[in-house]
Structure formats: C-alpha cells, structure tokens
Regions:
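FIC/Doc superfamily catalytic core
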Residues: 1-126
Length: 126
C-alpha cells in the first residue's frame, strides 16, 4: 500500500498555495510529521488504520487539526487525503464545494477518523 511522504505533502501544499493563493510556509514541522505518521500508526503491534480509506481519513484529520502550515491547511489536507486514495487505485467523486464544505465541517466539528472515513467511502466509485 502506498503512503504519503513528508516531501509529497510539502509538494501538495506548495501546489495548493500556488494555484489557490494564500501564504506559503510551514508553521510547525513536528505537527506535520505527526499528521503524516498517523497514516501508519500502530497500537499494540496492530495498524490503527489498516485500510487506505482510513489512512486517508487519518492524514486529513491530522493536517486539519494540527494546522502545521501558515495557510491552506484544510485545502492541503483534503488534496493529500484524496491523492492517497487515488494513488492506491480508488476513484473518488465529489463536487469541489462538497469537499470544501466537508473540510470546514472537520475543522469546526472536530470529526474523528471513522466519520471522515465514512464520508470518503460514500464518495468512492468502482
């Protein structure tokens, strides 16, 4: 299974800022590393998030909750999570406004990984 690296997430963030605007920059490297590590987190020797959808949800939540970037955290989180889904062979379909609204819902409602994973599953197509 493919997971995202620190370098890939930094590239995604740079792309987001370049194409949609905002202030570039990393606010806290440790928080970003923590968000990225969440996709491969183990508890008692077992993967906490075994499926690619759960890993995607974990990285989305981690970036949104930890705010490691100066700007563009929600946009970067969603693109990183959806990139992870695509890299692992899944097809995600949603309108841009749905994705934006859901990112805000995660940020304001502090949705957990299972809730984010459920939303992602509803938008997968064969």
């Amino acid at each position: 299974m493919i997971v995202l690296s620190l370098e890939q997430v930094l590239q995604i963030h740079a792309l987001i800022i370049k194409t949609t605007g905002g202030s570039a920059g990393l606010r806290d490297l440790g928080r970003l590393e923590s968000a990225i590590a969440s996709q491969t987190q183990n508890v008692f020797g077992e993967e906490l998030y075994p499926s690619v959808i759960d890993k995607s949800a974990a990285i989305i939540r981690g970036i949104i909750d930890d705010h490691p970037f100066v700007d563009g955290n929600e946009r970067t989180a969603m693109l990183a999570g959806l990139t992870l889904v695509k890299l692992n062979g899944h097809h995600f379909v949603a309108q841009t406004c749905e994705i934006e609204d859901f990112a805000v819902e995660i940020a304001t409602g502090h949705l957990d990984v299972p809730a984010i994973s459920s939303w992602l599953h509803r938008h997968l197509t064969p």
